[in-house]
């Protein structure tokens, strides 16, 4: 029983670390409002009254790879979940830093094979949108979206995956600006 409580506590800490990272890197009020709504839904905040009910949620970060593939990056746990479980499709490639808070990053394949250069760029973006952005040789797991699942009891943005590969990336901070979709 104590072991179960400790395991549950470790999951809570991991989840709250991802929320902290998202708050620290939130690009604006819309993203913070989404995080507030998530925390309310999880019972961490007792109430939340949005200032502007008509404000639409922030969109994913959007990039275009050197090979012409769209790369989408979630801004917070709710967006990560929406991106991975609802927007992305089976053969799209999903990237995430291994064992570290960060954004889900998806290459939209459109049914095409994804070149190595685009995979490298997506892995770079996954690192740049994570708590490991200043790291060296950061481990990034990637797999097809069809290998990702969510089970009951997992917090928003938390997923399970298998049949993955791992790339080791030293981030290039200038890459995100080069690939940003206009």
Show which residues each predicted segment covers:
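Intrinsically disordered, low-complexity regulatory tails
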Residues: 129, 133-182
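General structural signal for secondary-structure boundaries
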Residues: 28, 76, 172-173
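Hydrophobic alpha-helix feature that most strongly marks membrane-spanning transmembrane helices
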Residues: 14, 21, 110, 124-134
């Amino acid at each position: 029983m104590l072991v179960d409580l400790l395991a549950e506590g470790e999951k809570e800490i991991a989840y709250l670390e991802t929320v902290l990272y998202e708050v620290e890197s939130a690009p604006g009020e819309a993203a913070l409002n989404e995080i507030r709504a998530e925390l309310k839904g999880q019972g961490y905040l007792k109430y939340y009254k949005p200032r502007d009910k008509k404000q639409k949620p922030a969109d994913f970060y959007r990039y275009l790879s050197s090979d012409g593939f769209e790369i989408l990056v979630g801004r917070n746990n709710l967006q990560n979940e929406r991106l991975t479980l609802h927007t992305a499709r089976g053969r799209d490639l999903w990237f995430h830093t291994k064992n570290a808070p960060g954004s889900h990053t998806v290459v939209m394949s459109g049914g095409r094979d994804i070149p190595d250069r685009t995979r490298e760029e997506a892995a770079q973006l996954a690192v740049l949108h994570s708590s490991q952005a200043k790291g060296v040789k950061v481990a990034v797991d990637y797999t097809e979206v069809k290998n990702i699942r969510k089970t009951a009891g997992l917090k928003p943005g938390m997923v399970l995956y298998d049949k993955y590969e791992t790339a080791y990336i030293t981030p290039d901070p200038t890459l995100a600006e080069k690939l940003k979709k206009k």
